[in-house]
Regions:
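A short, N-terminal "cap"/entry segment at the start of jelly-roll beta-barrel domains
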Residues: 2-9, 13-56, 105, 139-142
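Membrane-topology and secretion signals of cell-surface/extracellular proteins
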Residues: 30-34, 50, 68, 88-89, ...
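N-terminal post-signal-peptidase region of extra-cytosolic proteins
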Residues: 43, 60-66, 74, 109-113
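A short beta-loop-beta micro-motif enriched in histidine and acidic residues
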Residues: 49-54, 66-78
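Soluble periplasmic/extracytoplasmic beta-strand elements of cell-envelope proteins
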Residues: 61, 87, 125-128
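Short acidic-glycine-tyrosine-enriched beta hairpin
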Residues: 62, 92-109
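Glycine- and acidic-residue-biased ligand/ion/polar-headgroup-sensing regions
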Residues: 73-92, 102
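Ligand-binding loop in jelly-roll beta-barrel domains
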Residues: 109-134
Length: 142
């Protein structure tokens, strides 16, 4: 029953126009939609985990030429690139390149690596839609 209600609310939320969800706009308030989708960037549908919901947000910085190492996320996550150029690669060689101002719905349960391909640090904010007690990232074992 709980999953059904969560699914209903997700459908309702995703079908509202952005301006319904926005603050009252005027000269001092500007709203810019970043992304709206039902799938991660590899085309897989977004599925929320069962359990007590927990949202986690973090700021990440990746030095020029550095990479995250191969890893995976068991829960949906959403990133916004604030600075630099980030390249995300899957094991099947699909690549997504992101610039400052672009958003990404990350892949779930799929190994991937992020790499700074620019000459300035990549800065991004990342939000996970997880559950209490669940790890957000698992590093690939060598």
């Amino acid at each position: 029953m709980k999953n059904t209600l969560n699914a209903i609310w997700a459908v309702v939320f995703l079908h509202l126009p952005f301006d319904v969800l926005a603050l009252e706009q005027g000269a001092a308030v500007s709203v810019t939609p970043l992304i709206r989708t039902t799938h991660s960037w590899d085309g897989q549908p977004i599925v929320y985990p069962a359990g007590q919901a927990e949202i986690t947000g973090m700021s990440i910085e990746i030095a020029p030429g550095a990479e995250t190492g191969w890893h995976r996320h068991p829960v949906p996550s959403f990133a916004v690139i604030l600075q630099g150029t980030l390249e995300v690669k899957l094991k099947d060689d699909r690549v997504k390149r992101l610039q400052a101002g672009e958003a990404l719905i990350e892949v779930v349960n799929t190994d991937h690596v992020g790499r700074n391909v620019g000459d300035i640090p990549v800065k991004l904010v990342l939000f996970y839609a997880g559950v209490v007690g669940q790890a957000l990232t698992t590093q690939e074992k060598p």
